[in-house]
Amino acid sequence: MARLCRRVPCTLLLGLAVVLLKARLVPAAARAELSRSDLSLIQQQQQQQQQQQQQQKQLEEAEEERTEVPGATSTLTVPVSVFMLKVQVNDIISRQYLSQAVVEVFVNYTKTNSTVTKSNGAVLIKVPYKLGLSLTIIAYKDGYVLTPLPWKTRRMPIYSSVTLSLFPQSQANIWLFEDTVLITGKLADAKSQPSVQFSKALIKLPDNHHISNVTGYLTVLQQFLKVDNFLHTTGITLNKPGFENIELTPLAAICVKIYSGGKELKVNGSIQVSLPLLRLNDISAGDRIPAWTFDMNTGAWVNHGRGMVKEHNNHLIWTYDAPHLGYWIAAPLPGTRGSGINEDSKDITAYHTVFLTAILGGTIVIVIGFFAVLLCYCRDKCGTPQKRERNITKLEVLKRDQTTSTTHINHISTVKVALKAEDKSQLFNAKNSSYSPQKKEPSKAETEERVSMVKTRDDFKIYNEDVSFLSVNQNNYSRNPTQSLEPNVGSKQPKHINNNLSSSLGDAQDEKRYLTGNEEAYGRSHIPEQLMHIYSQPIAILQTSDLFSTPEQLHTAKSATLPRKGQLVYGQLMEPVNRENFTQTLPKMPIHSHAQPPDAREEDIILEGQQSLPSQASDWSRYSSSLLESVSVPGTLNEAVVMTPFSSELQGISEQTLLELSKGKPSPHPRAWFVSLDGKPVAQVRHSFIDLKKGKRTQSNDTSLDSGVDMNELHSSRKLEREKTFIKSMHQPKILYLEDLDLSSSESGTTVCSPEDPALRHILDGGSGVIMEHPGEESPGRKSTVEDFEANTSPTKRRGRPPLAKRDSKTNIWKKREERPLIPIN
């Protein structure tokens, strides 16, 4: 029993092992049978495909044969995806048709058609094509370089005809050595020759062939190096989904072949290829450029490694170790350094850049010129109204009454507008250097130049010789306004003048308050500081004709030009005006005499006193050598009329200017001033000669009414005793009767005055000197006149009416003046 128990497990184990072995053997056999069946199926499918291709070729050959036979028709229908393609092959140099040239068609880089040309160099091919696929046609022949033609269309063609021109190969120089073979091109420049070198052992000659029968061809593919080449180069790269085509720009291209007995020899191995490169800015020694070879199975250029750029004999060369002879090009990949750039393309880029730059520069110049013209036009247009306003103002000034009579029309606004348009610096054309007592008499040319400058000045033609006297004693005068008017030491009656002047300046503060209150009532603002020296004469020194008693005194004292018919009324509007560092009496608003009653003529106060100034050296005779007979200063006199309400002060300035211009050598006979209002010469001015030389003082007073000139007749009966001075000294309105002045006329056209005249010197010096009395020249009637002045200082006595005879005499005098005009007024 024990033995049986031991045998049962052993048998069981052996049975299991057998079962397992059988189970493994059955699947292996089945698998073998399955694998054998798959192989047979694949082989059967391949056989069927080959049979179909053979049948298709037979059909195509049959169709071609039928087309050659006239009148034959094809019974087979052409599929939609097939179109007819005719290829014409010729020689590019001789333009001859090439027969027996191989033509191949590649669709999507797969060869679909391969045929040869007939005797006419043409062949007709049915090409199966689908839209979106690439199409390449190549043609080649022995002795010619292969020519590819990539082509792609978006529409299905029905018929197409193309022509391919083949370049003939260039025979090369072959150098056979014991171990190497060197092939070079036949180029004139040896420095840039391409060369191919390989081992002699790589050449395998056929039987009965000698090495001397070997012929080499090395051709530089110039057609591939042109930018506008129709036969553009297309390269392909292999990736996961398939082939990817890229556009190439070759930098170097070569075709190397070896023939022996008319047959091409295959050389495979390490071949050293050296090609010259085009000079490019983005290519330098050390760069690696991809190498491309033409694949006859795909019909495209395929990348096969990289070559190195080196510099040899100052030239760049591309060296590459090729695996076989054939077609090789050096072309960088698109988007990398040196891709698609050569000298021609750079020249085109530079040309366009220069052209665009020139266009941009011209446009900028045109725009700048347009804006410049527009700016000038706008400036002229804006400046025309101001210029027209200034011209109208000057014409209005010229057309006004140019006599010395005063007008009370308020034109201060017109003057202000004109002054704003003019340069302020022209108004203060002070010649401090010329106003020097030590300076000698100037020349005649200088005097004429200064006079012409006065006449041609633009701003109101105000002759401003020197304003330096304003600042000489301004501090003293501002501290004591009566200091310049008080006499130094008077032996007789100095107190009358002092009392009179103190009474005239006593109410300065009251008048100043009245000035500020009535400033706006008369429609004018403060006077510009540039004109303060014109309107600031505190007193007017006028000389009467009854004081000229002897002819010896006449050349030293001539009357100034006086206002014409009418009197000036000075009321409380006349008060001193203090501005910064200029303080003198300024009458604000003279009122015409027609507004006053006749009783006001009794209110004239005439202070008679023989006054003289200390003799000081001055240069007032500078104009004596060049003064004309008829001094015409229409601009100066005109401004005295226009600048109302300060016409009386401007009249004093006109007199001062004429006195300055008329100083010169003394004349033996008394002369009068003739002022031409319109600039006419002296010969055209009508004047008359009145001989009034008598022994006694006459009551006649002849004056040129139109010219505004006072002419005093000299009297030989007695010497000049004193000058008659009019001083504004009362608070009540005072009237200066200019008719009371005894004036006369003479025939001469030039007035002779000298600086020794004390009254005139006082006027020209701006009133800064002191008034002195000469007791030696006092007349018998002087005391009585002064006593009358003291007696009439009270307001009640000043209101008395003048005698009737005196008024009649004044009326008769004016009648005489009006009946005898000297010149016509245009």
UniProtKB/Swiss-Prot annotation:
<feature type="compositionally biased region" description="Basic and acidic residues">
    <location>
        <begin position="774"/>
        <end position="786"/>
    </location>
</feature>
<feature type="topological domain" description="Extracellular">
    <location>
        <begin position="33"/>
        <end position="353"/>
    </location>
</feature>
<feature type="glycosylation site" description="N-linked (GlcNAc...) asparagine">
    <location>
        <position position="268"/>
    </location>
</feature>
<feature type="region of interest" description="Disordered">
    <location>
        <begin position="474"/>
        <end position="493"/>
    </location>
</feature>
<dbReference type="Pfam" id="PF10577">
    <property type="entry name" value="FAM171A1-2-B_N"/>
</dbReference>
<feature type="region of interest" description="Disordered">
    <location>
        <begin position="52"/>
        <end position="71"/>
    </location>
</feature>
<feature type="compositionally biased region" description="Polar residues">
    <location>
        <begin position="474"/>
        <end position="486"/>
    </location>
</feature>
<protein>
    <recommendedName>
        <fullName>Protein FAM171B</fullName>
    </recommendedName>
</protein>
<keyword id="KW-0597">Phosphoprotein</keyword>
<keyword id="KW-1133">Transmembrane helix</keyword>
<keyword id="KW-0732">Signal</keyword>
<dbReference type="InterPro" id="IPR049175">
    <property type="entry name" value="FAM171_C"/>
</dbReference>
<feature type="signal peptide">
    <location>
        <begin position="1"/>
        <end position="32"/>
    </location>
</feature>
<dbReference type="GO" id="GO:0045202">
    <property type="term" value="C:synapse"/>
</dbReference>
<feature type="glycosylation site" description="N-linked (GlcNAc...) asparagine">
    <location>
        <position position="108"/>
    </location>
</feature>
<dbReference type="InterPro" id="IPR048530">
    <property type="entry name" value="FAM171_N"/>
</dbReference>
<feature type="region of interest" description="Disordered">
    <location>
        <begin position="774"/>
        <end position="826"/>
    </location>
</feature>
<keyword id="KW-0472">Membrane</keyword>
<feature type="region of interest" description="Disordered">
    <location>
        <begin position="429"/>
        <end position="448"/>
    </location>
</feature>
<keyword id="KW-0812">Transmembrane</keyword>
<dbReference type="Pfam" id="PF20771">
    <property type="entry name" value="FAM171A1-2-B_C"/>
</dbReference>
<dbReference type="GO" id="GO:0016020">
    <property type="term" value="C:membrane"/>
</dbReference>
<feature type="modified residue" description="Phosphoserine">
    <location>
        <position position="794"/>
    </location>
</feature>
<feature type="compositionally biased region" description="Basic and acidic residues">
    <location>
        <begin position="438"/>
        <end position="448"/>
    </location>
</feature>
<feature type="compositionally biased region" description="Basic and acidic residues">
    <location>
        <begin position="805"/>
        <end position="826"/>
    </location>
</feature>
<feature type="glycosylation site" description="N-linked (GlcNAc...) asparagine">
    <location>
        <position position="213"/>
    </location>
</feature>
<dbReference type="InterPro" id="IPR018890">
    <property type="entry name" value="FAM171"/>
</dbReference>
<feature type="transmembrane region" description="Helical">
    <location>
        <begin position="354"/>
        <end position="374"/>
    </location>
</feature>
<feature type="topological domain" description="Cytoplasmic">
    <location>
        <begin position="375"/>
        <end position="826"/>
    </location>
</feature>
<comment type="similarity">
    <text>Belongs to the FAM171 family.</text>
</comment>
<feature type="glycosylation site" description="N-linked (GlcNAc...) asparagine">
    <location>
        <position position="113"/>
    </location>
</feature>
<keyword id="KW-0325">Glycoprotein</keyword>
